[in-house]
Amino acid sequence: MSVENLSVASSTASKKGVVIIGAGLAGWHVIDAIRAKDTEIPITLITADSGDRYHKPMLTMAISQNKRASDLVRASGSEAANTAEVTLLANTQVTDIDPVSQTVQVCSTAQSDDALTTIGYEKMVLAMGAHPIFPKSLPQDLVWHVNHIERFSQLQEKLTTGSQHVAIVGAGMVGTEIAEDLLKAGHKVTLIDLNDAPLSQMLPAKATARITKAIESQGIQFLGGYQVSAVTRVNDDGNNNDSEDAEKLQVDYAPLSTNADNTDTQPLEPLIVDHVIASTGLTVDEQLPAAAGVEFDRRTGIVVDAATLRTNAANIYAIGDCMSINGVACRYVAPLRAQAATIADDILGHEHSGYDHKPPMIRLKNKAISVMVTGVPQAAGNWQVKTESDDELIMDLLDDNEAVSATVTIKAPAVPKA
């Protein structure tokens, strides 16, 4: 059930049960796992948005496929809540967690008053995800992100007016995937990164050089080794607002490192673009974990026990983008089902063998080049070539004991037969 009135929600949740904070893939996976084993235990799902169910990884492929946000939604939040028989508090912000009384304070984001409502819990699952990092040079009022379906929908609407020039800052997996998607949709794309090649924080130079060549061969402009210093409106002075440039943005950038002995270095001409997308990484909000006394790592998120996904705070679990295992952030979709099953068993008091975390296979969704990674990759390290040809590169990352800790396989796309 979906509840608009928080006073009703408080009485509905008076039976306590399970409270889940966050209605992304992780939160809904936990609900699915619990309901598969117990149809009676009360579950309250709290989310700052509508709680609609959709597959977030599809956002980096949807524009070229001409898919609207409504096409990606599998079920509205209220529909999904009714099906699962859970209490959904949509458009609701959690302001505090008291681990002693096992209560949360919430308020509505859809109503003008700031009245707080208290909801109790027996078990809590933090599934609040991670949010985009915006460096000071990328003001949020001018720069897009595609980490949420609502912002994706707003950007897509802007891109329907015809071919436009989009600058993407950050050439990790998401930025590189979005670049190809926008190009296929007919837009001009400039991809900017601090590193010399895409995916440089996870793969060695020999591998990333092939990715650079592939995306540039498509027509994507890649600016590697550059840092964006500012994004501003072209006509912030208020003049010429009727010109074609009225809504355009100026992107100032410079080489990350310059040769101090080179006195001939000239300032670079800024880019003039229609839109800027930030793909500069994710971070986890520390406020709620701190309030709950949950151990937190500012780099990787909420710290959990590897076998049970419990935090150090009694009766509180974490799952998905907001949590980390053994110092490594868990920001991939593939493990969510197994993580949710472990949490469900632990909450319900069922015997279970414990969660066995295995790094998921990572696939770049670009069609220009096939990139597949297994293990735990990192750019620095003892990477050894296993296979190398014009069409294929396979490299292994060896640890100190000469054991393989990661493998990257890069293949050129198959050429269609005439």
Where are these regions (language model features)?
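Mid-to-C-terminal Rossmann-like scaffold of FAD/NAD(P)H-dependent oxidoreductases
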Residues: 3, 13-16, 322-417
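Rossmann-like NAD(P)H-binding beta-loop-alpha module
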Residues: 154-203, 207
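FAD-binding core/adjacent interface of flavoenzyme oxidoreductases
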Residues: 2-21, 74-165, 169, 250-270, ...
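Short beta-strand/turn micro-motifs composed of small residues
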Residues: 22, 47, 170, 193, ...
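FAD-site-proximal beta/loop scaffold in flavoenzymes
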Residues: 141-162, 264, 269-338
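Residue-level detector of alpha-helix initiation sites
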Residues: 24-28, 50, 132, 150, ...
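Beta1-alpha1 glycine-rich phosphate/pyrophosphate-binding loop at the start
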Residues: 3-86, 181-202
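A Rossmann-like FAD-binding core segment of flavoenzymes
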Residues: 42, 83-115, 119, 185-304
